[in-house]
């Protein structure tokens, strides 16, 4: 016997092929750059469930949703451009499985990393390994509703977006904290470990049916207000030491994705891993922000420039007073995350840019395959 939700999905699956072909399904994995509210449902110090977060997010009328920015994430913007009727809901939201086949699901979690121990100081978070396990549970639900063959066909056409790795590197560059710290690994060992674990999770997602993957490289973390303050970097400059760690990881990731494409496409030509070059995109934006119509790439729009970097609404403030006056002109929303304005610029480039932006081709081309 079908439940009410299952009946809805059976009916949905019987709709015309034209409607199905035009739909956009996205399964999103990652950290706070793409978290849309999973951390609202766990005990964690990494939350964005209070004002002024979400102040410019129209679907919630400016109320916080758990997004770590003032408006839309890059995944939100890409989804809209490719025809999504609404963003994939957070996996941990009650009854969220009812959206699995229609829109996909968002498994991302603020403070999460590729490595399980990343984000330990924030207490609660959902590491990538656990996010993939949660997708496996979602897949079991799909099979119950539309069968194994229907699930395989749906997943073959769905997008799998992975945006993670920043927290692993941010944890690495932070000063050691007594009782929580261990001897730091050599940089190349950290990078190799990140790539190895991420590759393992990507292969697992492929085994579960994923065929269209967008793997986002780590951005220039040496340019975010947090890292610049930590390293006493003056305005207009970035920490080259931090960015060097990021570049080394990204280069190894690119090599791994090329290997995956060669290996897995020989088994199934539908398989494609796209590398999204967020590093060069965001670095160009930070260093040339005025060319993009922005006015500030140094200070966060909300919260302090020095510890504790908190972005919150004071007791006698409204949401607008807690943030900068013109949010559409800032690159950074808080000390760690970009504004919707910056996300728009990066998302548009990833959608339609050339091979310097996304390789072997851009996201729109991948979606149309």
From Swiss-Prot:
Name of protein: GDSL esterase/lipase At5g41890
GO biological process: one example: lipid catabolic process
Similarity remark: Belongs to the 'GDSL' lipolytic enzyme family.
Origin: domain of life: Eukaryota
Key words, A-Z: Hydrolase, Lipid degradation, Lipid metabolism
Statement: the UniProt record of this protein carries the keyword Hydrolase: yes
Pfam families in the cross-refs: Lipase_GDSL
A molecular function GO annotation: hydrolase activity, acting on ester bonds
Taxonomic path: Eukaryota, Viridiplantae, Streptophyta, Embryophyta, Tracheophyta
